[in-house]
Amino acid sequence: MANVVVVGAQWGDEGKGKVVDIYTEFADDVVRYQGGNNAGHTLVVGDEKIVLHLIPSGILHQGKRCIIGNGVVLDPEVFIREITNLKAKGKFQDDGVLLLSESLHIIMPYHKRIDIAREANSGAKKIGTTGRGIGPAYEDKIGRRGIRLMDLLDKQVFSRKLKEFLEEKNFILEKLLGERPFTFEEIFDEYSAYADTLRNYVADTTLVLHQDLKAGKKLLFEGAQGTLLDVDHGTYPYVTSSSTCAGGACTGTGASPRDINEIIGISKAYVTRVGSGPFPTELEDADGEKLRHTGGEFGATTGRPRRCGWFDALVIKYAVRVNGLTGIALTKLDVLSDFESIKICTGYSYNDKFLNELPANLDVFEKCRPVYEEMPGWQSDITGVRSFEELPEKAKNYVKRLEELAGCPIVLVSVGPRRDETIMLKNPFEA
């Protein structure tokens, strides 16, 4: 038996959706443990592209239980829309396989309005929030002002808490942000209607997980965003508001650290980032544009063009360290196929010093310049390759060099967006 955590090893958008989709075949439960609809998983099934923001990728596999844990903040409107769309496409029929933690926190309308207004008023200090209300919802969770799913399902409790919290939120909206306040009735009526649908999926998911673990079932924990966006371990303040690292799989679901056997970090064969913040290997030239165009680097959630750059070994070394990675899934190797030469960042130059580890100080990180080594490209189509041995020699050398620099084995290589365009070197569920 093995239970596996999948985390982003960079700044998000690494291709976790595809890898989770592949690993789901070997799991019984797929569990989402943090974030909200600020993340987007893009899956290509046959000729169809499916984007999921909240519901775990495992929903596309029959007989798999999908759980959204207590660490997630849920926008009911988005959740219901995803269910409706999946059902319309014939991808989801059995309500019983999808469970919501009764303890997860709800994104309220005032969270979204506050989020958008703050970002608009931030000027040069914008962090690049998606405006989905994720940060303000987590603020209220930590500040003990949050409304949980169990509260929403009880009209008396929901009414009491909404009245209690709305006065403060309206003060912030009107007096500090210059925005329109909400009436109690407009929120209460809208969210009470959502509750009627949500109650069909609610469960004590921590208990369900432990029962499944006791029964010997295999669990796959699905993270969102990436290590460098973790609220504690990321490039603060240019981070998300949740624990994106492997430890979040426990706090966000109620699973024990002893239940985790394998931790797989997902990394592109290059690097991308959305929003503001330091990015030493960013390319603002023809190579960067080529990566963006060839890799289709536009956000699944926002549609924003992603910043693109060469592979940064220091970022991956850091992800290996703070997550305890047991393996790396390398994605989008095929995107590099047209490059005559490829660069790898092996260190940083800072004030005439050479750094071989990621600096914790943001001011230092922002001033770091990449130190590169260069490798020849393979300049051939690899999307039809299904074994490591079949890869061009120069592609194999590139993968081996990344593995060496990361200090962690590469256990999967993605050579295209489709599910079958994958080379699995080691199955973590059989470890």
UniProtKB/Swiss-Prot annotation:
Which SUPFAM superfamilies does the entry mention?
Answer: P-loop containing nucleoside triphosphate hydrolases
Q: Where does substrate bind?
A: 300-306
Going by the UniProt record, its keywords in alphabetical order are: Cytoplasm, GTP-binding, Ligase, Magnesium, Metal-binding, Nucleotide-binding, Purine biosynthesis
In which residues is IMP bound? Answer: 13-16, 38-41, 130, 144, 225, 240, 304
Keyword Ligase found: yes
Partners and quaternary state? Homodimer.
The entry sums up its family as follows:
Belongs to the adenylosuccinate synthetase family.
Record protein name field = Adenylosuccinate synthetase
| Source organism per UniProt | Geotalea uraniireducens (strain Rf4) (Geobacter uraniireducens)
